[in-house]
């Protein structure tokens, strides 16, 4: 089996012409759909004091003040790949953190998460869905009004930001605890 990689094309539908090197008269056009490198799915969301809308370029516009630290917005969607992924936020809003968590078939969080600016992470076995979160990292959240570009992609190398294929997934409020919160004493 041969793999065909298409580069330099914008996401959408196109045709690929495949021709024989032995007999150039033998060729065929194959319709293909070029998908975004950005694996995230998101869209409008509101909850915990924050509101997100989708800009015309596919980035998110986030406004409001989170209700508390580690509160914010989240979107859950089917996991589109296996292997290693990396998360980057080339355009960010100070005081908001982005992460992607791995969920099993029952919606329970599996070990690990991928955070923006961190290393590439192997998707754990049993992952069925991903949960993309934008949470306040401030102890006392302040008002936000800005644009954010986030990209989750396969592999361990981050590339230039692309609009994700799905920017119409409704999101909602999320409240999470950082890993260290699980180890606090009462």
Range-by-range predicted roles:
Residues 8-10, 22, 79, 89-94, ...:
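Non-cytosolic beta-sheet module surface loops
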Residues 9-11, 23, 55, 80-82, ...:
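Surface-exposed coil/turn segments at beta-strand junctions on protein surfaces, enriched
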Residues 31-69, 81, 124, 133-186:
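Extracellular polysaccharide-targeting segments
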């Amino acid at each position: 089996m041969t793999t065909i990689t298409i580069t330099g094309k914008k996401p959408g539908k196109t045709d690929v012409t495949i021709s024989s090197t032995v007999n150039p008269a033998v060729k065929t056009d194959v319709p293909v759909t070029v998908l975004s490198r950005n694996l995230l799915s998101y869209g409008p969301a509101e909850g915990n004091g924050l509101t997100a809308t989708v800009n015309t370029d596919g980035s998110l516009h986030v406004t409001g003040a989170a209700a508390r630290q580690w509160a914010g917005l989240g979107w859950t969607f089917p996991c589109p790949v296996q292997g290693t992924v990396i998360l980057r936020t080339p355009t960010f809003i100070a005081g908001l953190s982005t992460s992607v968590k791995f969920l099993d078939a029952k919606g329970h969080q599996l070990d690990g998460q991928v955070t923006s600016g961190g290393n590439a992470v192997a998707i754990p076995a049993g992952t069925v869905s991903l949960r993309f979160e934008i949470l306040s990292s401030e102890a006392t959240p302040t008002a936000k009004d800005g644009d954010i570009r986030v990209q989750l992609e396969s592999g361990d190398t981050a590339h230039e930001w692309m609009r994700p294929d799905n920017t119409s997934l409704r999101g909602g409020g999320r409240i999470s605890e950082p890993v260290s919160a699980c180890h606090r004493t009462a």
